[in-house]
Structures are given as C-alpha cells and as structure tokens.
C-alpha cells in the first residue's frame, strides 16, 4: 500500500492509515475504499500547495471523509459520522487546535 506521503506529515503514517482501514465497514475494493482515499489524499496535497491551506486538516479530511460510509451510493450521514469518528481520534492519533478541529468538522459535514 502506497501512502503517497510527503517527506514529512504530522498525521499520515502507516499505523494511522491502517487504523482508518480497520474502521471502514465496507469492501476496500469498492468505490470509496483505500484506493479512493489515496487519490483524494494525493489531490488534496496538490491543492494545499496552490492554496496555502492547512495541510494537517486537509490530510485528515482526505483520509477520514469516507471511513464511516455504510453503502457505496446514497449515505447522507456519512460525513457526520466521519466527523464524530475524527473526534474520537483527536488526542490519541492526532493533535488539532480547536479552530483546526472546527475546520475539519465543517469539511467533513
């Protein structure tokens, strides 16, 4: 599994990605599994370079946005569940300021 990581990342490491994979209840071979997360992560990092956005928040969004999906099609609450999941990870898997957590929650929901 390629993480497509930059030289350094405050949040993306093998253990964190594996933890997110374990939390995913669907088939990773589907549309919204691991390969999708890695494509979104790659594109998110490209956008950060041009927009000067918060890399940590963008990386977390990219990895977490579909982790709580329950189906491949219509699942309007998956973002809210992802935001709740992010809240359970904060402090153990990553550190965010309150403002950064608000940004992540807004992006996920």
Predicted regions and their residues:
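Generic alpha-helical segment signature
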Residues: 9-13, 33, 37, 60, ...
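Divalent metal-dependent catalytic cores for phosphoryl transfer on phosphate-bearing substrates
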Residues: 53-109
């Amino acid at each position: 599994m390629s993480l497509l990581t930059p030289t350094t990342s405050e949040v993306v490491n093998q253990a964190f990605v594996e933890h997110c994979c374990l939390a995913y209840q669907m088939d990773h071979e589907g549309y919204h599994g691991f390969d999708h997360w890695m494509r979104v992560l790659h594109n998110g990092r490209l956008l950060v370079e041009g927009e000067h956005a918060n890399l940590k928040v963008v990386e977390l969004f990219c990895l977490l946005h579909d982790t709580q999906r329950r189906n491949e099609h219509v699942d309007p609450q998956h973002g809210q569940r992802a935001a709740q999941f992010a809240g359970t990870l904060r402090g153990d898997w990553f550190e965010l300021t309150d403002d950064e957590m608000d940004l992540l929650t807004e992006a996920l929901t």
